[in-house]
A protein has these predicted regions:
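Structural motif
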Residues: 1, 37, 46-55, 95-103
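Beta-propeller fold detector
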Residues: 2-19, 52-70, 111-129
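Short, structured patches in soluble enzyme cores that scaffold and shape functional sites
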Residues: 3, 27-30, 42-44
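Structural signature of eukaryotic scaffold interfaces centered on beta-propeller domains
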Residues: 19-37, 71-84, 133-141
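Short beta-strand elements that form the blades of beta-propeller/WD-repeat-like
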Residues: 36-44, 84-93
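An amphipathic alpha-helical core segment
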Residues: 66-67, 91, 99
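A structural motif
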Residues: 78, 95, 100-117
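Non-transmembrane domains of secretory- and envelope-associated proteins
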Residues: 107-108, 120, 126-141
Length: 141
């Protein structure tokens, strides 16, 4: 790793998790000008959890909780506003096919189909069987 202010290289510490992490996406709370504090959250596809990276620059992951969905190694998410803002994720549970739009809880990790009161997952899909791979998602706040 490189310190962007000084240019000095830093050796990362030992990763200390029961299962090696497979971080497929990350998002910050309070990611806007003038903020005094921020928290980095990650999606770990090996454990299917929302994790907090604490401290952000050390790469230490603390599990927040299970997503309740299985990730196949692809996904994207963003947090609009502060810690109580909109947390939106596009996740793919199969090896191919469409992504599904979810909201995530920053306190429990639980994924809920986005604005879908019927429970019909097809109403929250992005793309079809050959739809595009979602690499990033951004919410304008």
């Amino acid at each position: 790793r490189i310190n962007v202010e000084t240019g000095i290289t830093i050796t990362d510490g030992t990763i200390n998790r029961s299962t090696p992490a497979k971080v497929v996406a990350g998002a910050y709370t309070n990611s806007f000008a003038g903020t005094t504090a921020t928290t980095l959250y990650d999606l770990d596809a090996n454990e299917n959890v929302l994790a907090k990276q604490n401290p952000p620059n050390d790469g230490t992951l603390e599990n927040v909780g299970p997503l309740g969905v299985t990730l196949n190694g692809q996904g994207a998410f963003d947090i609009a506003g502060g810690a109580n803002g909109l947390v939106l994720a596009a996740l793919r549970s199969g090896a191919s096919g469409p992504f599904t739009l979810y909201t995530l809880s920053l306190t429990s990790g639980a994924a809920t189909l986005y604005r879908n009161t019927t429970g019909d997952a097809s109403l929250s899909l992005i793309g079809g069987a050959s739809g595009p791979v979602v690499r990033d998602i951004a919410i304008r706040f």
